[in-house]
Amino acid sequence: MTKESSVKIGLIGAAGRMGKAIQEAASQQDIQLSGGIGRKGAEFGSYNDSESLAKASDVLIDFSTAAALKDNIEAALHHKKPIIIGTTGLTEADHQLIEQAASKIPVILAANTSLGVNMLAALVKQAAAKLGSDWDIEIVEMHHRHKKDAPSGTALLLGRAAAEGRGEKLEDIADLQRCPATEPRETGRIGFASLRGGSVAGDHMVVFASEGERIELGHRAESRIIFARGALKAALWLADQSAGFYQMKDVLGL
C-alpha cells in the first residue's frame, strides 16, 4: 500500500470550488478521502461535522469559511490531527488561534497551495532584496466575480514576500487602496490593485518599476486543479510532521 492510498484525508468545505477540485485531484492520484463536509453537513461519507470527520481522518484540509475556523481547529486539536488551512479572509484573532493550535498539532496556513505561486513568492522576495526601495512595487490580482476578499490571500502572500525582502513588515508599508487619491505615490510603499470578474481562477502580477524600466513577475492559474494537487501534497507531507506552524515553502523545500 502506498502512502497516497493509506493516509486518510478529511475535506472541510467539500461543496465549494476548491473542495470539488480536491475531490477530482484525489481521484486522479489514488489518494484516499475519508469524507467531506460542506455548509449543510455531509457531502460524502457519513460525517456531519468537523468533529466526527476529524476522528475518522489522519489529516484535515480546510477550505471552508473564516466563520467555521474555530470549530474546525477545535476538532483537530481534540483528536490531535494535523490540519491545512486554505481559508482566506482571516482576522488577526484567527491568526492568533492558528498560532496557538500549532503549539500542539502540525498546522499549515496556506494562502495558495500551488507550486508556481510559491516559487513566484520566493523570486519576489529575492528581487525585492536586490533592487531596493527606490524600485516601486505594485501587486495586481484578478479573480472570479464571486470572490469576497480583496486583496486576495495570494496577493498578500506576495506582498509579504516583497516586504520581507526589504526587511520590512507588510502592514507598515502596504497601500491596500488608493481611492480617492490626492497625493503622489510614496517611495517605499507596496501598492495593491484587485480586479473581479468572470470565472478567473487567479491571476497575479508583481511589478517592480524604476525610472525607464520595469520588471514584471507573474503567475496565471488556468485551473483550480493546481491548487488541489498542492493541497493534497501538503496533506501527505503534514501527516509525518511534529507539532508546529508550517507554510507551503516548507512543503516544497523553497
From Swiss-Prot:
InterPro entries: DapB_C, DapB_N, DapB_N_CS, DHDPR_bac, NAD(P)-bd_dom_sf
Principal location: cytoplasm
Annotated positions binding NADP(+): 39
One matching Pfam family: DapB_C
Catalytic activity field: (S)-2,3,4,5-tetrahydrodipicolinate + NAD(+) + H2O = (2S,4S)-4-hydroxy-2,3,4,5-tetrahydrodipicolinate + NADH + H(+); (S)-2,3,4,5-tetrahydrodipicolinate + NADP(+) + H2O = (2S,4S)-4-hydroxy-2,3,4,5-tetrahydrodipicolinate + NADPH + H(+)
Entry keywords, A to Z: Amino-acid biosynthesis, Cytoplasm, Diaminopimelate biosynthesis, Lysine biosynthesis, NAD, NADP, Oxidoreductase
Binding site for NAD(+): 13-18, 86-88, 110-113
Residues the entry annotates as binding (S)-2,3,4,5-tetrahydrodipicolinate: 144, 153-154
GO cellular component: cytoplasm
Catalytic-site annotation from UniProt: 143, 147
Record GO terms (molecular function): 4-hydroxy-tetrahydrodipicolinate reductase; NAD binding; NADP binding; oxidoreductase activity, acting on CH or CH2 groups, NAD or NADP as acceptor
Highest taxon of the lineage: Bacteria
Function recorded in the entry: Catalyzes the conversion of 4-hydroxy-tetrahydrodipicolinate (HTPA) to tetrahydrodipicolinate.
Cited HAMAP family: DapB
Protein name as catalogued: 4-hydroxy-tetrahydrodipicolinate reductase
Organism annotation: Zymomonas mobilis subsp. mobilis (strain ATCC 31821 / ZM4 / CP4)
